[in-house]
Structure formats: structure tokens, C-alpha cells
Amino acid sequence: MKKLCINISLFFMLLTLSSCNDWLDEVKQTTTVSDEIIWQDETQVDKYVNSFYPLLHDYGQFGEAQFYGSFTESLTDAFKYGSYTLGHRAGHPNLYVLTPDAISPDNCLYSIWLRSTAYKQIRETNQFLSLQRKYSEFSADRNKLWEAQVRFFRAFVYFQLAKRHGGVILYDDLPVSTNKARSSAEETWQFIADDLDFAANNLPKEWDAANKGRITKGAAYALKSRAMLYAKRWQDAYDAANNVIALKLYGLTDKYEDAWKGN
């Protein structure tokens, strides 16, 4: 009898362990996320795309990647100290005026190469696009919407490089070599134009309320218009600006002060 009870107990123990294994097989791993797992969940991909949006601040007027977050007017005769320069950079504009030797070949503050910032971001956009091609099984329209946003940001970073250096090294995929030749200025501007054309063709004019603030068709056209001015491609700049106007979503503010309200 005792032996029978032991056998029955062992049977139910094994049955329980088997059920546990089945349950564990169904649990998604969330503490460490693989590339493949991200591309199985639309929400996770949206978050992946969101990781590129801080670039708008980083390379904006007050961003750390743009002249250390300080005013570039301090390099000109038009300098006037502003009311807002980020945190510990607050005194930098005055520093540049009073001690111009603070800027040297070894301490070039007007640079976006610090910590390999620009090409690090370009590599991350290319990594997103590479993983998308490899793993995404979402609809073509959904994929284009993600790709359009990421290619906008790739163009945005290349624009920061091109307006300073002209031709730069172009990567449209993950690099296989660190010795790639520098492209011409014309090739660089065309690369930027192509990315922005794709973005403009695949982004919506407006997003729903839940996605307000995302890159739009108008933003892609506007950036292309500005980039083509630097490239001296006047007709392309004109056409892109007209495309923004044709959307009938934007206009000049009645009062200059309203331009700073961020609405």
C-alpha cells in the first residue's frame, strides 16, 4: 500500500512539472529583450522608433550636440546673451566673447563629432532598418510608416554633417568597413533628399491625438526645403516649400512673440 501511494505521488509530481514546463514555454521573456522579440510586438517597435526623437532636441538650438547647447551668436558681432542656455553651459556665450582662445583646434566647440555622436546615431538608424528587413512581419504600410520616421532622422543627422563639411562618408546600411571613401557634396545632398522624399511620401499629414508630435509629411518637406537651400538646389528648395504650403496646415503667426509658444 505504501509503495502504491509513493507511485501515485510521483505520477502527480511529474504531471505538475510537465504542466509547469508548458506554462513556462508560453511566458514571454521581458527582462532581456532580443531583436527578434521586439519585432513581434508593434508597441515595442513604436518605442524603438521613439528612441530617435530626442535627436530633435540634441541637434536643436539648445541641444548638447549643437555647440554644447550654447548660442552660436557668441561667435559673431551680433552676440546678445540670451535668457536660456542649458544648465552648466549657462555662462559659455560670455566665455567665448571674453576669452576667444577658449576655442582651439583641440577644443572645437562648434562640432557634432564629440563622442562620435553623429555617426553613432546614423549607425543606430541603419541598425533599425536592417533589423526591420530581417524580422518584421507587419504590413507593408506599417513598415513604411516606421521606416519613414527613421529615415527622416537619418537625413536630419546627415544634414547636420553636410551643412558643416559638405561631402561626408555615407552609410545606408550597417558598415562592413571603417575605411569607406568620402562622398562628394552632391552625393551627400542627394542622399539626404532621397531619405526625405521617402519620408514625405509615406508619412501622414497629421497624426491622431495619441501620436501627436510625431514627424509628419510637412516636417519632411520643410527639412528638405532647408537642406536644399544649403545645397544651392534652388528649385528643389522652392518645390519642397510649396509642398508644405499646399498642405494648408501651416501659416505665419500674427505676432512674433507667438512663434515661441510651441503650439
Describe the residue ranges of each PLM region.
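Bacterial N-terminal signal peptides that target proteins for export
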Residues: M1-I8
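Membrane-proximal, proline-rich intrinsically disordered regions
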Residues: C20-T72, K255, A259-W260
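Hydrophobic helical h-region of N-terminal Sec-dependent signal peptides
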Residues: L10-L14
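Conserved, well-structured interaction surfaces
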Residues: E42-D46, N50, P54-G60, T85-H165, ...
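Short, surface-exposed recognition loops and adjoining beta-strand edges that mediate ligand/DNA contacts
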Residues: V33-E36, F62-L86, Y171, P204-A220, ...
